[in-house]
Amino acid sequence: MLNPPHFIIIGAMKCATSSLYQQLVAQPGIFMTTPKEPNFFSNDEIYAQGIPWYEGLFAPAPPDALRGEASTHYTKLPTYPETIARIQSHVGDVKLIYMMRHPLQRLVSHYIHEWTQRVIATKTDINAALDRHPELIDYSRYSMQIQPYLEAFGPENVLPVFFEQFCNAPQQELERVCTFIGYPHAPQWQELERDNVSSQRMRKNKLRDAIAYAPGISTIRKNLIPKEVREWIKDRWRMQKRPELGAAERERVTAILDQDLAQLGAWLGVELTCATFKTAACTSPTGWPGWPSL
């Protein structure tokens, strides 16, 4: 492959990958693809476009820039089973960044996202959705998702980053990421507008979107309709209350996730459960001392 990425943010979905992407875009000498998430190695229909299409995403990069992309589909097993083999085949040596957050909170944000995208039906609450959409739990099973990457690329090429510590000490975590990818300069955290916030997303509606985003309409809307009125209208299309798991479902899901976290914690050298996750994450485990191949 010509000019392959030097690094890839591989997930997890709803774990601040967009924020990290934006911060890396803001650093001189780092080139990130547009779109943020090519999903080339995961999605069959995109992979079918061929390597030249993917190479073209990096064509605008300056010759001496570090090149990266950020596709959260790359850690969505079992949905996309061919991802790792494709990365190995076409990219070879690459640095991988895996962002994680409290798995129950990630699950809830994932549910909201899928609700806004109409993947989950309007009247399907989060408890019913767990059985109909097992990916809500699967994508929060971090050890299951990251194990094949550790096996394929080695722990020295996979950086664990925790959402909680990323929010708590952003400059420190940005420096850690940049050191990992081989960035030769001192990165500076930028105060940027938050993007991809699930609670602010409106549920998709084809007719509404066709009218609202028609050429010229957006400018008229912003100039003639007060912001307060626009926000009131948007709220009609947003989830009004953050969903909560029922007691029985929370207990069931916690048991599944705790089993997965026990394995993840063993590799990271910290005790991890749903109950201890936030505290442990802020100790910022930086490597994989418990990985058996070390």
What residues fall within each predicted segment?
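Anion-recognition interface
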Residues: 1-294
